[in-house]
């Protein structure tokens, strides 16, 4: 059985994927809360930390533009709009956790979880792509920032 956080990430992925799909199809009748609540109800007995799922979904939506801006230079040969929707969603989730939850979840765990989601839901090459982009993001955005802050001391 999947760990509680892993299952939470699956629910977040399903929610974000469906919400993006429906909004791009100009379905104005749906709200992200509606989609999230429906998905949480499906797994209600298995998910203990619903706040984690809600924070992840809301954070990715709130920071989507900034997350996309961070992904672009890391994967310049793949315009964000041309990355498969599932891969794009996994990248956004992973990057959000790397940037905003590194104090709660170790970066290597975040990357591994994203790779596992890509293996389960993406294409044959998704896991390698996700691993490469998030690994580069970790090295350039997180490690470099940490190195710069210690160098200034």
Over which residues does each language-model region extend?
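N-terminal interaction/assembly modules
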Residues: 1-127, 131-153
